[in-house]
UniProtKB/Swiss-Prot annotation:
Pathway: Carbohydrate metabolism; tricarboxylic acid cycle; isocitrate from oxaloacetate: step 2/2. Catalyzes the isomerization of citrate to isocitrate via cis-aconitate. Contributes to oxidative stress tolerance. Modulates cytosolic citrate metabolism during lipid mobilization. Required during seedling growth. It comes from Arabidopsis thaliana. Substrate binds at residues 182, 301-303, 632, 637, 795, 876-877. The gene is ACO3. Disruption phenotype: Reduced cytosolic and mitochondrial aconitase (ACO) activities by 25 and 55 precent, respectively. Increased tolerance to oxidative stress mediated by paraquat, a superoxide-generating agent. Delayed early seedling growth, altered assimilation of acetate feeding and elevated citrate and malate levels. This is Aconitate hydratase 3, mitochondrial. GO terms for biological process: citrate metabolic process; glyoxylate cycle; isocitrate metabolic process; response to abscisic acid; response to oxidative stress; seedling development; tricarboxylic acid cycle.
Length: 990
């Protein structure tokens, strides 16, 4: 039988709660004794599939915040054979919600009610009043979803007692309100869901059980490339090429939007996922059939954190973790510490939000916030616009935090109105958050909140700056930039070094560009891109860039024609206000024509640079530069030929494009010669804060947001012409090079395989620090001599049609070949040789990483990876775990892991191990030429989260590592060979 949303047990919860006793009592009186969720029998049961079943969210999801051509209304039918089995047990739980005593009505001013909600103040517990606002969202979710089954009263108590429990690394379940996807990560997610349906079929179960049970929004934004720039026709030309390359992927996603319930797909050309989420999709407060609760979201993109600026709890997770969340599996997470970041004062004239976020990133990176929430507060908050806050929240992955959270205040409400949310919706949001003590009013005295640690920044101290040349947290002030650049040229190859000999540093390369003389030097800018949701969501810096362009035009400055300039807004709203202000005209004159609505250069979709420019760089070993308003600048990410990549505000992107080089001191050196040969300095073209505020006030209007988003799901003619089958099971084309059935569930049975042995494994790769997911699974161009290129050419794909690795993530055969294919990767086994190769230890041959991995795999040999600190930092890229798994990697031993990547490794059945503090491969004398045995118990009941394990080598070395299975649920996943097999077996048993 199936229960529809209207007939589900949730209605009985509401009915029972509405007749609750009017008396309010303390939290401790709500709790009743029950079996501990951490008892040995409970833990053992959790590791088998019989006890943990997915959550069945029974609320229908409707979004009423603004006029819209559609509603987010689920047509969910909860997968419910399990309810037949547990009906008698759950019937009493449904009518007797553990917290029915705090379920109350939120009245409307003037009569009526907004709905009902679980009241945190009604707990009458003083500990709640001191909780950080971000933790209150976790608390409300736990209370609302408490069923003493998936979420227990003990879990609720852990969160309430956060001050004492968070230092102990306790585990809690969390059930986000929705899931957010983009197409690079969304395609493999939908591929996995389709493959899971097939697996359910093969196991004799109902394939329709594989359906999202929470709202899923997928925005197609990662596919557009800057093939055409500096042209009025660039948007249309790039979109046509985008559809030519990605027609099959887009049709697959369109099929997914019809085959899977509760899934919305926003067509290409609409904007960047995080900006669309901020301006439109974000609810702040859900009103679902009269039940009010805070919006929360997990997304398959690490910059999902941008929504934290709106007061919505959100962060990035791996694709496989998101898939489990879609299917009702609660997320298991360690209750995080919260860093309180106090902002004081006000930014000086001419300083931008980008300067602020780069400063904050450097401070937090130094403080150490991995696995923690950061919550901003202080009197400096009142001077930050919502867009400024979103910029800071966006870069949470760059400073290492799970979230960079800004509680809702009056600035948030003003932004909601600006972006077209209805007055009634905003009134409901404010009333709910005030009633539940989740609203901050900086005009009122602030109650002290407890944080795990504290930081403070006086906004007066923020200086204009950029970050680079290879990492987002390597901030350089503008006044120090020239000296820092020369230091980078001098220093040995590393994060801040290129090792260019002194005698070669002033080299000038002359070449011909379109028949005109041109020249390049070390530091010459060849790409200047206003890109990324980080900054294009912020009208002040976008209009500031337009003002810089206007002043430059007025003074007679012009960007050199061989610099590839581009502007890619995160939503159509940006185009509207740039046109209304009249500033787009001047950006066009400087070459910053709009090229498309998507991520573009920020994720490596910068397109080709001119052949003559490329030849001048490669033939003369020039360290060319890219300057972009993005959030990441890791090696090889922006473009293969730009070894120096700097993050800057949009106005500075225009300024550096005008200067043509990063080798400049803007305070003392002119940008160029203007009219009549007069020197023009940065100060001559830099707008004042008042100038920017004036144009923002006159040009950014609510009607622009309404007009843009009323038509966002209608698509364009190319999207609407895509025809898709109506089948709920996907018909795999074995010859497709975009969509391929992955082998994850091949030969799968109902019996969990248990922990796998790692005995006498070879080291596939030996890495140093800061190996990113871009190194592990690049998203950009497919190099012509790579294993992936060979695979495509063997199947008749021309080089011009290779597309990017990111666009090929629906094909496991290509992605396995693209794993560790970054051309800038440094493997210690190669003794200084840079590139995607390794040594096959038994033969001593130098091979591509893929070829070596396949040789090990074909001979039945396990492999492991050695790594340094921050392994897997960067994008939340599940292929950085899927790829190694398909290559046969059984374990990664590192000094430390980035949060999302560690979770992804666990999700794919790979063992993450950490060296003990003060130790690493070098200090232990490990070269990677040894064979490794990991002495992990083969009985899952004998493994504990975070336990120590001994690793031995064939040459007699022995050392201790910490197993980074952090929770009991992760051990259950490991027992099943990964999270997806675990979910399939669970659903098949019901």
């Amino acid at each position: 039988m199936y229960l529809t949303a209207s007939s589900s047990a949730s209605s009985s919860i509401i009915r029972a709660a509405s007749s609750r006793s009017s008396s309010l009592f303390s939290f401790r009186s709500v709790l009743s004794p029950s079996v501990s969720s951490t008892s040995p029998s409970s833990l053992l049961a959790r590791r088998s599939f019989g006890t943990i079943s997915p959550a069945f969210r029974r609320w229908s999801h409707s979004f009423h915040s603004k006029p819209s051509p559609f509603r987010f209304t689920s047509q969910i039918r909860a997968v419910s054979p399990v309810l037949d089995r547990l009906q008698r047990t759950f019937s009493s739980m449904a009518s007797e919600h553990p917290f029915k005593g705090i379920f109350t009505t939120l009245p409307k001013p003037g009569g009526g009610e907004f709905g009902k909600f679980y009241s945190l103040p009604a707990l009458n517990d003083p500990r709640v009043d001191k909780l950080p606002y971000s933790i209150r969202i976790l608390l409300e979710s736990a209370i609302r979803n408490c069923d003493n089954f998936q979420v227990t009263k003990e879990d609720v108590e852990k969160i309430i007692d956060w001050e004492k429990t968070s230092p102990k690394q306790v585990e809690i379940p969390f059930k986000p309100a929705r899931v957010l996807l983009q197409d690079f990560t969304g395609v493999p997610a939908v591929v996995d869901l389709a493959c899971m349906r097939d697996a359910m079929n093969k196991l004799g179960s109902d394939s329709n059980k594989i359906n999202p049970l929470v709202p899923v929004d997928l925005v197609i934004d990662h596919s557009v490339q800057v093939d055409v720039a500096r042209s009025e026709n660039a948007v249309q030309a790039n979109m046509e090429l985008e559809f030519q390359r990605n027609k099959e992927r887009f049709a697959f996603l369109k099929w997914g939007s019809t085959a899977f319930q509760n899934m919305l797909v926003v067509p290409p050309g609409s904007g960047i996922v995080h900006q669309v989420n901020l301006e439109y999709l974000g609810r702040v407060v859900f009103n679902t059939k009269g039940l009010l609760y805070p919006d929360s979201v997990v997304g398959t993109d690490s910059h999902t954190t941008m929504i934290d600026g709106l007061g919505v709890a959100g962060w990035g997770v791996g694709g496989i973790e998101a898939e489990a969340t879609m299917l009702g599996q609660p997320m298991s997470m360690v209750l995080p510490g919260v860093v309180g970041f106090k902002l004081a004062g006000k930014m000086r004239n001419g300083v931008t939000a980008t300067d602020l976020v780069l400063t904050v990133t450097q401070m937090l990176r130094k403080h150490g916030v991995v696995g923690k929430f950061v919550e901003f507060y202080g009197n400096g908050m009142s001077g930050l616009s919502l867009a400024d806050r979103a910029t800071i929240a966006n870069m949470s992955p760059e400073y290492g935090a799970t979230m960079g959270f800004f509680p809702v205040d009056h600035v948030t409400l003003q932004y909601l109105k600006l972006t077209g949310r209805s007055d009634e919706t905003v009134a409901m949001i404010e009333a709910y958050l005030r009633a539940n003590n989740m609203f901050v009013d900086y005009n009122e005295p602030q109650q002290d909140r407890v944080y795990s640690s504290y930081l403070e920044l006086n906004l007066d101290d923020v200086e204009p700056c950029i970050s680079g040349p290879k990492r987002p947290h390597d901030r350089v002030t503008l006044k120090e930039m020239k000296a820092d650049w020369h230091s980078c040229l001098d220093s040995k190859v590393g994060f801040k070094g290129f090792a260019i000999p002194k005698e070669a540093q002033e080299k000038v390369v002359n070449f011909s560009f379109d028949g005109q003389p041109a020249e390049l030097k070390h530091g010459s800018v060849v790409i200047a891109a206003i890109t990324s949701c980080t900054n294009t969501s912020n009208p002040s810096v976008m209009l500031g860039a337009g003002l810089v362009a206007k002043k430059a035009c007025d003074l007679g400055l012009q960007v050199k024609p061989w610099i590839k300039t581009s502007l890619a807004p995160g939503s159509g709203v940006v185009t509207k206000y740039l046109l209304k202000s009249g500033l787009q005209e001047y950006l066009n004159e400087q070459g910053f024509n709009i090229v498309g609505y998507g991520c573009t250069t920020c994720i490596g979709n910068s397109g080709e640079i001119n052949e003559s420019v490329g030849a001048a760089i490669t033939e003369n070993d020039i360290v060319a530069a890219a300057v972009l308003s993005g959030n990441r600048n890791f090696e090889g990410r922006v473009h293969p030929l730009t070894r120096a990549n700097y993050l800057a505000s949009p106005p500075l992107v225009v300024a550096y494009a005008l200067a043509g080089t990063v080798n400049i001191d803007f305070e003392t050196e002119p940008i160029g010669k203007g009219k009549n040969g007069k020197d023009v300095f940065l100060r001559d073209i830099w707008p004042t804060t008042e100038e920017i505020a004036e144009v923002v006030q006159s040009s950014v209007l609510p009607d622009m947001f309404r007009a843009t988003y009323e038509s966002i799901t209608k698509g364009n003619p190319m999207w609407n012409k895509l025809s898709v089958p109506e089948n709920t099971l996907y018909s795999w084309d074995p010859n497709s090079t975009y969509i391929h059935e992955p082998p994850y569930f091949k030969d799968m049975t109902m019996d969990p395989p248990g922990p796998h042995n790692v005995k006498d494994a070879y080291c596939l790769l030996n890495f140093g620090d800061s190996i990113t997911t871009d190194h592990i699974s690049p998203a950009g161009n497919i190099q012509k001599d790579s294993p992936a290129a060979k695979f495509l050419m063997e199947r008749g794909v021309d080089r011009k049609d290779f597309n990017s690795y990111g666009s090929r993530r629906g094909n496991d055969e290509i992605m396995a070949r693209g794993t560790f294919a970054n051309i800038r990767i440094v493997n210690k086994l190669m003794n200084g040789e840079v590139g995607p190769k390794t040594v096959h230890i038994p033969s001593g041959e130098k091979l591509s990483v893929f070829d070596a991995a396949m040789r090990y795999k074909s001979s039945g040999e396990d492999t492991i990876i050695l790594a340094g600190a921050e392994y897997g930092s960067g994008s939340s890229r599940d292929w950085a775990a899927k790829g190694p798994m398909l290559q046969g990697v059984k374990a990664v031993i590192a000094k430390s892991f980035e949060r999302i990547h560690r979770s992804n490794l666990v999700g794919m059945g790979i063992i993450p191990l950490c060296f003990k503090s003060g130790e690493d491969a070098d200090t232990l004398g490990l070269t990677g030429h040894e064979r490794y045995t990991i002495h992990l118990p083969t009985d899952i009941s004998e493994i504990r989260p975070g336990q120590d394990v001994t690793v031995t080598t064939d040459n007699g070395k022995s050392f201790t590592c910490t197993v980074r299975f952090d929770t009991e649920v992760e051990l259950a996943y490991f027992n099943h060979g990964g999270i997806l097999p675990y979910v399939i077996r669970n659903l098949s048993k019901q």
